[in-house]
């Protein structure tokens, strides 16, 4: 599962997830990409589920890049615990996604196969996505 090795602080504040992705919004490593069209939070487990779906569909061919990283800790208090007594412990890690962010990239496979693989990964994602190709200048 993806998570940071070390962080300066164990817990973070909530913060708002607004605006569009100005970085990481173009296909830069592979030929095809899966781009988010809505905003949300993707957990480390969802990222891994998407990666597995893609790699199992393309079998041995091609190369996959994961373009997002879960660097935000989400805390939870245990069940049936009264309010107060401080912030809960870190339960899982998420990546905050803005519209336009490229989530995965693939190279070395045909376009049809890439579309099918990304469709399987998109079914695991909590955000709407679209298929994009590398823009050649």
Curated annotation (Swiss-Prot):
Keywords: Ribonucleoprotein, Ribosomal protein, RNA-binding, rRNA-binding, tRNA-binding. One of its GO terms (molecular function) is tRNA binding. One of its GO terms (biological process) is translation. Belongs to the universal ribosomal protein uL16 family. SUPFAM superfamilies: Ribosomal protein L16p/L10e. This is Large ribosomal subunit protein uL16. CDD domains: Ribosomal_L16_L10e (cd01433). One of its GO terms (cellular component) is cytosolic large ribosomal subunit. Binds 23S rRNA and is also seen to make contacts with the A and possibly P site tRNAs. The keyword Ribosomal protein applies. InterPro entries: Ribosomal_uL16, Ribosomal_uL16_bact-type, Ribosomal_uL16_CS, Ribosomal_uL16_dom, Ribosomal_uL16_sf. Part of the 50S ribosomal subunit.
């Amino acid at each position: 599962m993806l998570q940071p090795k070390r962080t300066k602080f164990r817990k973070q504040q909530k913060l708002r997830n607004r605006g569009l992705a100005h970085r990481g919004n173009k296909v830069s490593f592979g030929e095809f990409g899966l781009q988010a069209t809505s905003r949300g939070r993707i957990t480390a487990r969802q990222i891994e589920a998407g990666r597995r779906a893609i790699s199992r569909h393309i079998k041995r061919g091609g190369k996959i890049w994961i373009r997002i990283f879960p660097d935000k800790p989400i805390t939870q208090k245990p069940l049936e615990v009264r309010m107060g007594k401080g912030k809960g412990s870190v339960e899982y890690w998420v990546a905050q996604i803005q519209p336009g962010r490229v989530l995965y990239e693939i190279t070395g496979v045909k376009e049809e196969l890439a579309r099918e693989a990304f469709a399987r990964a998109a079914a695991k994602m909590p955000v709407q996505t679209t298929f994009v190709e590398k823009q050649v200048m």
